[in-house]
């Protein structure tokens, strides 16, 4: 019987150099958010409750900006993720706008294809994502003049060309990525310094957290998104929210 136990990803240790450069990054983030709020006061920030999104939530709330903060409860979240919604609202004394899937559409999908259909093919997994994530997000953004995300270039190959401001062609509205040029340790330096609420799964080897069936812990040295849809090729590893 093998006694080998793989080492899992851990929250990075922050260096003094990274701490020293944080004030400039935080000031730039605040300026970017204020720019968006001035141009589009009713813009919506779509939070997945990831550490990147908690950083942006913290800045929005500290600055008391009028931006909407929306999130999706797909019906397949880990309990730890659901608990973070309540913790965030308590910490910042605000209400997140929580959007959920159409119950009948979600039930019909599972009746026809089964509860584990996402493992059967990329097509079925994307259909599940559409029902549980894309359609609710479309409802959330229906009247939004612009929206914001916590995406970063260094997260994955599919995000390597992100910019601060982009055009969401599918909705014909502006899309902003206010920490697009941050590195992973910049995010954790902010989270540590400002004490932002975090998902407990980060302490269990999960650097990237989605729905429970589609997320696993990541081994030390793996790409931080290796635990998302791990059974698929890296070229298909997006849910479609950010096309």
Language-model features, listed with the residues they occupy:
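Nucleotide-activated chemistry modules centered on ATP-dependent adenylation/adenylyltransferase
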Residues: 2-243
């Amino acid at each position: 019987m093998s006694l080998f136990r793989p080492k899992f990803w851990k929250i990075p240790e922050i260096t003094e150099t990274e701490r020293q450069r944080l004030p400039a990054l935080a000031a730039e983030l605040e300026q970017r958010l204020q720019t968006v709020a001035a141009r589009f006061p009713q813009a919506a920030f779509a939070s997945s409750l990831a550490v990147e999104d908690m950083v942006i939530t913290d800045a929005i709330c500290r600055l008391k900006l009028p931006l909407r903060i929306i999130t999706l409860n797909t019906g397949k979240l880990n309990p730890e993720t659901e608990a973070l919604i309540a913790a965030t609202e308590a910490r910042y004394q605000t209400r997140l706008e929580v959007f959920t899937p159409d119950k009948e559409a979600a039930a019909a999908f599972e009746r026809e294809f089964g509860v584990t259909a996402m493992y059967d093919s990329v097509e079925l997994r994307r259909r599940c994502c559409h029902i549980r994530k894309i359609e609710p997000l479309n409802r959330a953004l229906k009247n939004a003049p612009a929206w914001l995300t916590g995406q970063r270039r260094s997260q994955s190959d599919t995000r390597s060309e992100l910019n601060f401001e982009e055009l969401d062609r599918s909705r014909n509205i502006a899309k902003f990525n206010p920490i697009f040029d941050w590195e992973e340790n910049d995010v954790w330096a902010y989270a540590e310094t400002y004490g932002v609420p975090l998902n407990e799964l980060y302490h269990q080897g999960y650097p990237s957290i989605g729905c429970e069936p589609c997320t696993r812990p990541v081994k030390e040295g793996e790409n931080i998104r290796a635990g998302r849809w791990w059974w698929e090729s890296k070229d298909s590893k997006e849910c479609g929210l950010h096309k």
